[in-house]
Amino acid sequence: MTKSYHIAVLPGDGIGPEVMAQAHKVLDAVRQRFGIRITTSEYDVGGIAIDRQGTPLPQATVAGCEQADAILFGSVGGPKWEHLPPAEQPERGALLPLRKHFKLFSNLRPARLYQGLEAFCPLRSDIAAKGFDILCVRELTGGIYFGQPKGREGSGQYERAFDTEVYHRFEIERIAHIAFESARKRRSIVTSIDKANVLQSSILWREIVTEVAKAYPDVKLSHLYIDNATMQLIKDPSQFDVMLCSNLFGDILSDECAMITGSMGMLPSASLNEQGFGLYEPAGGSAPDIAGKDIANPIAQILSLALLLRYSLGADDAAEAIEKAVNTALAEGYRTADLASASNAIGTSEMGDVIARFVAQGA
């Protein structure tokens, strides 16, 4: 009997619903071509949930996600809700609690410069011409963002603020395994990022990553200090395959990787727990200024679906078919407004149609 899967779909705010609609088209094409039994249920999250139910993360949404095999997330937030206390705003009140509730400890952010889009890369043309395909693997639940103690105290010239960087062995081991396993499916190169010349937490990080590497003799490991890594990423991003980072360093480097691709509308992300359950979302925001205008780029949402199929459902063939279809669409000149002049751009919905058609055709 064919196994069936269930996805909790959380479109959210801004461009979320319209780009999610394109992911649904692509999912329909995947079902038909590969015969995978996948059902979906939609739930409110973010600002629309505040408007309808008084909270950015309703209990019904959490319960629906608990019954699912994975979460496909759109985007949340917008000016309408910025007057609320920070903890009640869509971003902090929805996404962070979901990550905590499902113990999502690893964040995977692919950053790729697609052929034909080199002109959008802010790097020098000779660097962009080499292309790059990087996977940033970021530890998501440890480090300085969560370490204790943290706070402020004192007054006058003695007023001070403090945060604490803490990492446990098990936290470093499990994120390192994610990086090495991911590298095996790519070019088998891991670059671990730390500040082991200064920080005790980074010394432990480097020691443990080196130990874990022994279980992956087919994967090449190197280490870079964070300051050098940021420079090397600008100098020659093509040298990197998988970048393994702590929470703070990954936060910085994953955004740097995103920026040098030239369009946030192309970048998916995955956040996973130890059981393979994941939340998949575009790396960009809700872009309320372009919502409802049929000009948003849906590719990040569609590629987030591909990551979901690969990491949570184990459907590598279907994931590769989506990625190939995106490649084909771009190679044949299909562009949304962020990647083209207004005169030759296609809309959000048409881009979804094109990619779904290519998935169905195996193009």
From Swiss-Prot:
Annotated NAD(+) binding sites: 78-91, 285-297
EC numbers on record: 1.1.1.85
Names of required cofactors: Mg(2+); Mn(2+)
Cofactor binding note of this UniProt entry: Binds 1 Mg(2+) or Mn(2+) ion per subunit.
Pathway it works in: Amino-acid biosynthesis; L-leucine biosynthesis; L-leucine from 3-methyl-2-oxobutanoate: step 3/4
Keywords annotated in UniProt: Amino-acid biosynthesis, Branched-chain amino acid biosynthesis, Cytoplasm, Leucine biosynthesis, Magnesium, Manganese, Metal-binding, NAD, Oxidoreductase
One Gene Ontology term from the biological process aspect of the record: L-leucine biosynthetic process
Pfam families named among the record's database cross-references: Iso_dh
Positions contributing to substrate binding: 99, 109, 138, 227
Any one Gene Ontology cellular component term annotated for this protein: cytosol
Coiled coil: none
Catalyzed chemical reaction(s): (2R,3S)-3-isopropylmalate + NAD(+) = 4-methyl-2-oxopentanoate + CO2 + NADH
Molecular function per GO: 3-isopropylmalate dehydrogenase activity; magnesium ion binding; NAD binding
Family, per entry: Belongs to the isocitrate and isopropylmalate dehydrogenases family. LeuB type 1 subfamily.
Record's protein name: 3-isopropylmalate dehydrogenase
Natural source organism: Pectobacterium atrosepticum (strain SCRI 1043 / ATCC BAA-672)
